[in-house]
Amino acid sequence: MLPDLSAAPMQDRYGRPLRDLRLSVIEACNFRCGYCMPADRVPDDYGLDADQRLSFDQLETLVRAFVAVGVTKLRLTGGEPLLRKNLPVLIQRLAAIEGIEDLALTTNGALLARQAVALRQAGLRRITVSMDALEPALFRQMSGGRGEIDQVLAGIAAAEQAGFDRLKINCVVQRDVNEDQVLPLVEHFRGTGHVLRFIEFMDVGSCNGWRPEAVVTSAQLRDRIHARWPLAPLDANYTGEVAQRHAFADGLGEVGFVSSVSVPFCGDCQRARVSADGHLYTCLFASQGHDLKPALAEGEQGLATHLRQRWSVRADRYSEVRASTSRRRKPVEMFLIGG
């Protein structure tokens, strides 16, 4: 029996509050990136039936319940969220929820050019674009032969025109795969107002072939960049920010580093994730989720009570104990959880 915590502050077993919700609106993707959804493991026709995904009504109720227990930051993920039909309609509904201070979306950018204006008009405030290479052939290869860098760059340009003037650009760096793209990416985005962030290759899921030797640490990346463009550390924007921020000494913006492997940040993790079919994951490295649909059927208040109970027993800190523990269960794939 889970405790009744309806009147208590929303904290897990380590005193961590819940402030950030990553909400997957679709599990399907038009790319097949090797570290997430490799083509040899995930067929092109993979995906849930539409009626298995949470409806817009369910998603709105779910977000309202999360806001009731403390969430202020909402990020829509996938899969590729721009594949979700009528997404701007959903965004308009979510943007109207009182208490949501930040509404963002993560995309591979291939479909962004045609949707950027509608997303902005609907109330989306920020966009993060995943981009692991600038070189066209390598980009195509890393996306499983599905993506073209020109499409993504066009999407970024369209987002700028629509009023998204400060995008985040995420790059997952893998040794001997795309580490030679780090400096070209920095050179491309310096001075644009966008924030490039380098993410250590993580052991999320079980089909990406992760091994420690493939990780290029943030410290190594920072040293390479600093040797070309001197950097100075910046303070975090808020408690729980995952990226270590550094400013270019010449004033041409900043770059970030997400160091889940080499410098775990579990102690400040304030995030929950919900999959497109309504399962709650309290850690990106989870081996199982919790189906929220029964509680969701009880309405906003019933779900909020359930979330308080679930969060109160959260004790996840996988990245901190990665080296000293072995997984007993197969981890859930990142494209199902929603990175």
From Swiss-Prot:
Stretches assigned to the Radical SAM core domain: 13-249
User: Which molecular-function annotations from GO does this UniProt entry contain?
Assistant: 4 iron, 4 sulfur cluster binding; cyclic pyranopterin monophosphate synthase activity; GTP 3',8'-cyclase activity; GTP binding; metal ion binding; S-adenosyl-L-methionine binding
Q: How is the cofactor bound?
A: Binds 2 [4Fe-4S] clusters. Binds 1 [4Fe-4S] cluster coordinated with 3 cysteines and an exchangeable S-adenosyl-L-methionine and 1 [4Fe-4S] cluster coordinated with 3 cysteines and the GTP-derived substrate.
Q: Name one GO biological process term.
A: Mo-molybdopterin cofactor biosynthetic process
Q: List UniProt keywords, sorted A-Z.
A: 4Fe-4S, GTP-binding, Iron, Iron-sulfur, Lyase, Metal-binding, Molybdenum cofactor biosynthesis, Nucleotide-binding, S-adenosyl-L-methionine
Binding-site list for GTP: R22, R75, T106, K168, R271, A272, R273
Which cofactor(s) are needed, names only? [4Fe-4S] cluster
Task: Provide the E.C. number(s) assigned to this enzyme.
Answer: 4.1.99.22
Query: Pathway, according to UniProt?
Result: Cofactor biosynthesis; molybdopterin biosynthesis
- Pfam families attached here? Fer4_12, Mob_synth_C, Radical_SAM
Binding residues for S-adenosyl-L-methionine: Y35, G79, S130, M202
Question: Member of which family?
Answer: Belongs to the radical SAM superfamily. MoaA family.
Question: What's its job?
Answer: Catalyzes the cyclization of GTP to (8S)-3',8-cyclo-7,8-dihydroguanosine 5'-triphosphate.
This chain belongs to the protein called: GTP 3',8-cyclase
